[in-house]
């Protein structure tokens, strides 16, 4: 397993993801979305997992709603904005190779662990 956890802020779901993999002694890499620039292919993988670009946008909290991307409706505009400002993504985004979850999804993570053993 090659786990990467993409985060833009510490929130309960991020802590759940960290705890899940720590408890199972599964190594993971934290990717800070404020520092890590996403590539277009990487973002497209996340969009496929979320179902739409709009579903990836963080809309929780006052600061998130101040971002222009929180009010965009066109996928192409959202994608361009997310490439420039990946901190606007919901987190955590947990990646295991080409498999991705958005938010805390322990059932899927358990499946990944079962497949790896």
Labelled PLM ranges:
Residues 1-24, 28-33:
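Local sequence-structure signature of Cys/Sec-based thiol-disulfide redox active-site neighborhoods
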Residues 35-117:
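Thiol/selenol-based redox catalytic cores and closely related redox-interacting motifs
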């Amino acid at each position: 397993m090659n786990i990467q956890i993409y985060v833009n802020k510490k929130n309960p779901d991020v802590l759940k993801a960290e705890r899940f993999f720590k408890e199972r002694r599964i190594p993971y890499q934290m990717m800070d979305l404020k520092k890590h620039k996403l590539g277009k292919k990487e973002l497209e993988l996340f969009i496929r997992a979320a179902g739409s670009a709009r579903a990836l946008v963080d809309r929780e909290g006052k600061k998130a709603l101040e971002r222009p991307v929180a009010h965009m409706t066109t996928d192409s505009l959202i994608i361009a904005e997310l490439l420039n400002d990946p901190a606007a993504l919901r987190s955590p985004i947990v990646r295991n190779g080409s498999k991705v979850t958005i938010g805390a999804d322990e059932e899927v993570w358990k499946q990944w662990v079962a497949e790896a053993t």
